[in-house]
Design a protein with these regions (language model features):
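Short, conserved recognition motifs on repeat-domain binding surfaces
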Residues: 1-364
Length: 364
């Protein structure tokens, strides 16, 4: 097969389901190298793009961190990175790739703080999930980092999927400000970043265990929505602030100051019909806003940063404003060591069976 034209190989591989593509890697060295190239993932999923998910049989294209009431086991998403999800299902934790139906159970018994975090909605932002590709392999390694907030000092508990330990690294900020509630950490260039209420940032590198305090300042105006993200086009942290009329995008400059990069007129929303709205996602290419009208399902509006226009991304059945923890998921064929294909998950493990059912139910 390695003697075939590359466009023909692509045509064959793109017609296969994700599991079959993974199996094809085992047939010869050429295919293993070809499929392992990160560019293959990018090209294969270029027409699919990134998505938002929530676990619901009614709306399979979005995922939220809120409890899934469809089944007996509550399901939460704690993180999303490089095509993998960190899931809490009935108190059991998994790293899963919903596009390949592969997953790996995690032992969390050694953690001293994870349970306290996941049982409190306002502490969900304390969990960081970092995924990196192992060089020259399709496998990825991951680390889970729980940040411990102690007045002006911060500590870090780390897991590589096998064990938990408290890092020797601590950092003390120069000012008192709490971590921004319900604001997910951003993983950028090997470092996890946690936003604080005053606009400053706690940064931690899971690999080197080095931490630093970024003394940036941002004063949030009343009646504004705030969203912490990264601009993938320029590899910089971004802060999106918006009202019903206008949305402003700021990027973190090298001098540790938030610089205004873009101002956008918000999508038109009828005030008399509007129940609530929120910022959902930003990646430098797209900005997603959720609008909920009274007695109607919610609508996701997407703004194309290059075309400078609004469009409709989809709808959601969620009616509560509290359901705001959406996660961007970029399709990938990669997997982590010791994960399992769904058919190999023991049927006697109810949480694992539930995970399998959830992934299948969501059309992946």
């Amino acid at each position: 097969m390695d003697h075939l034209p590359l466009d023909l190989i692509d045509n064959i591989l793109f017609r296969l389901d994700p599991i079959s593509v993974i199996v094809m890697q085992c047939t010869n060295k050429f295919l293993r190298t070809y499929i392992s190239d990160p560019k293959f993932d990018s090209y294969r999923f270029s027409l699919v793009g990134s998505s938002l998910f929530y676990i619901s049989r009614h709306a399979p294209f979005y995922v939220t961190c809120q409890e899934n009431i469809i089944r007996s086991y509550p399901c939460y998403i704690l993180g999303s990175c490089s095509g993998l999800l960190l899931l809490d299902i009935g108190g059991c934790f998994f790293v899963a790739n919903p596009f390949t139906n592969r997953s790996r159970p995690l032992d969390h018994s050694g953690s001293n703080i994870l349970y306290d975090i996941v049982t409190c909605v306002n502490k969900a932002m304390c969990v960081g999930f970092a995924v990196d590709r192992i060089q020259n392999q399709t496998k990825k390694r991951f680390k889970i980092v729980c940040i411990v907030e102690m007045q002006m000092m911060y500590g870090f508990e780390i897991s590589n999927g096998h064990s938990w330990r408290l890092s020797e690294t601590t950092i003390t900020s120069s000012s008192k400000s709490d971590l921004a509630k319900r604001t997910k950490p951003v993983y950028l260039e090997g470092t996890l970043h946690w936003l604080r209420n005053d606009g400053s940032i706690i940064a931690f590198n899971p690999e080197t265990e080095q931490a630093c305090f970024i003394p940036s300042v941002f004063h949030q105006e009343p009646e504004t929505e705030l969203f912490f993200a990264s601009d993938d086009k320029i590899n910089r942290l971004a802060l999106v602030s918006g009202t019903k009329e206008e949305i402003s995008v700021y990027t973190l400059a090298e001098n540790a100051k938030w610089a205004l990069a873009r101002q956008i007129k918000n999508v038109f929303m009828e005030q008399c019909e509007l129940e609530f709205w929120s910022l959902v996602m930003y990646d430098g290419k797209r900005l997603v806003v959720r609008e909920k009208k009274r007695n109607l399902e919610g609508v996701f509006h997407v703004y194309d940063m290059e075309a400078n226009n609004w469009g409709v991304l989809g709808s959601t059945f969620w009616s509560s404003k509290g359901v705001t923890d959406f996660y961007k998921l970029t399709p990938s064929l990669s997997f982590v060591e010791e994960d399992e294909v769904k058919d190999n998950i023991p049927c006697y493990d109810p949480q694992a069976s539930y995970l399998t059912a959830t992934l299948v139910e969501n059309g992946v």
